[in-house]
Amino acid sequence: SGDRRFDLAALYYGLQLQLVVYMNAAMEMEARRHPDKEIVPAAMLYYHVTDPMVESQVELSPQEINEQILEQLRMNGVVCGEEDIIQRLDREMGDKSTVIPVEKKKDGSYSARSSVMSSQELGLVSAYVSHKVRQIGQEILGGHKEVNPYEKGSNEACTYCAYKKVCGFDPGIPGYRRRLLKELDRQEAFESMEEELGDEHRIYAGSTEGH
């Protein structure tokens, strides 16, 4: 129900795994149903459940009102950048989709406002989240339960924590520190994932190609 935004750096740090966990589960189910086929993810998207309101200083036509409503309801997340997949997700798309976070420039390439990944990048994200979930599970089973909140830019784990009043964390007491998480751009996040996973999933690090 919240207006959630996909954050690749937050995913790398293990703070935003749920959407990819769901995608992986769906892919595993489809792989069991269709063992003779390659399962390719098309997208992983958030849909904000809301009742949009249109405000305007000028009178709008019914079509203009509908376009603004669709704009507010457009899903966000990540879409596979293969053209046939995008056409299946939004068959009526022109230069800008009202359904998925994809826009095209005049030359047909995706604009900077688009949220697309290649199938290789989606595969890397999928493998990394599976690795991260196993890692976190092993830490839980190993008894790791330290009070160790993060700070990433202006975001702090304690801000909306339901247990803030009982956990006892106080940065004013010596020994209590937040984990300071570095901001990562898209390529840095992908390369950091590759470093943890090893050569099998390497599509960025060591490459001279720009992304």
Model-predicted regions and their roles:
Residues 1-211:
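Structural signature of nuclease core domains in nucleic-acid processing machines
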